[in-house]
Amino acid sequence: MRRNLLLLLCLAGLLAVDAQTLSRSEVETYVINQYGKRWKDIALYFGEKDTLDKDNALTFEKTISVRGKSKNELFVDLNYWFLKTFSNASSSIEMADKELGVIMAKGYLPGIAYHSGGYSSYCVNIRPLVRCDIKDEQVKLTIVVPNYEVTKVDDGIWSAMLDEDFDKHPPYTVNETWSLNDCFPFAKKDGTKKTSSKALVMSHGYVEVLMNRIQMAL
């Protein structure tokens, strides 16, 4: 039962974003089709191209040209799409200003990476920040992955061996924030390389899929 606790916590997060049109399974399918499943190698590939900003966050930008559509038309289309997609307690629209031509939203994708072993198990979630700057015939997308939100459960094999009452009390669970500069491949000395590798690859996948979806909405 203890071994299933983290899986249940991850599942609860997945159910919480069921209303979103962008799910973890869709992102993972996209990532596997595009890059494969060698998480560490793919993370190293991205690490060679990625540069963390002054806040140790990853920032992605893309400019989409939409011929023949005015600023107001693009705003209406995007605002409608965001209302459908970011519509629950975990993901939401933070700002929608038609006059300024700005839409800002906060996304959420739980369970992008999971690892169990050693002393603890980990379930990694991301909460990307999305901004659209809208002009006539053009939308500039900016997506920021600020960190990894991690649920850590001390239920690993070593915890079981060292705790005589392992099965008699609930495991210790804590929510952590992992700074990207402390995670592989940005940090070479990372005790959770496998988890960090998949988290980075899935973050890239989320951004790519989200950008594609936004472009299709225009």
Model-derived features with residue positions:
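Bacterial Sec-dependent N-terminal signal peptides
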Residues: M1-R24
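Ser/Thr-rich, low-complexity intrinsically disordered terminal regions
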Residues: Q20-L218
